[in-house]
Amino acid sequence: MKTFMANESTIQRKWYVVDAEGKTLGRLATVVASVLKGKHKPTYTPHVDSGDYVIVINAEKIKLTGNKWNDKIYYKHSGYESGLTETPAKELVVKKPTALVEKAVKGMIPHTSLGRDMFRKLFVYAGPEHKHQAQQPESLEV
């Protein structure tokens, strides 16, 4: 018996919707990253993007434990001298509510071209509305 290796023609992708309201950021991100990678499927193949599409709604109502709203700092650098910018989580969620979920999930998928393809299948929305009703997404419990 030959070992099964998935390829683009054998993969069947599904759409899932996740409600982030009241969910802890890291616990939500691990489940979403696993679905994006395709690890929830018995046909998972490491070198093929076999994951499904994930829609995250209510990202602005995500929960952080402890004092992380003040203590968790996100860094970015412009490339110039003294170009380091520090932004606490509570300021980042006001500027761009979807950024917390996107950054958490992006850190949990491979940092390669395959990982970029996986990340393109993630859609994060701040509120309860999304524009993917035509894909008939299934609810995914976290």
Swiss-Prot record:
Keywords: Ribonucleoprotein, Ribosomal protein. GO terms for biological process: negative regulation of translation; translation. It comes from the Bacteria. PROSITE patterns: RIBOSOMAL_L13. SUPFAM superfamilies: Ribosomal protein L13. GO terms for cellular component: cytosolic large ribosomal subunit. CDD domains: Ribosomal_L13. The keyword Ribonucleoprotein applies. GO terms for molecular function: mRNA binding; structural constituent of ribosome. It holds the Pfam family Ribosomal_L13. InterPro entries: Ribosomal_uL13, Ribosomal_uL13_bac-type, Ribosomal_uL13_CS, Ribosomal_uL13_sf. Part of the 50S ribosomal subunit. PANTHER family: LARGE RIBOSOMAL SUBUNIT PROTEIN UL13M (PTHR11545:SF2), RIBOSOMAL PROTEIN L13 (PTHR11545). This protein is one of the early assembly proteins of the 50S ribosomal subunit, although it is not seen to bind rRNA by itself. It is important during the early stages of 50S assembly. Belongs to the universal ribosomal protein uL13 family. This is Large ribosomal subunit protein uL13. The gene is rplM.
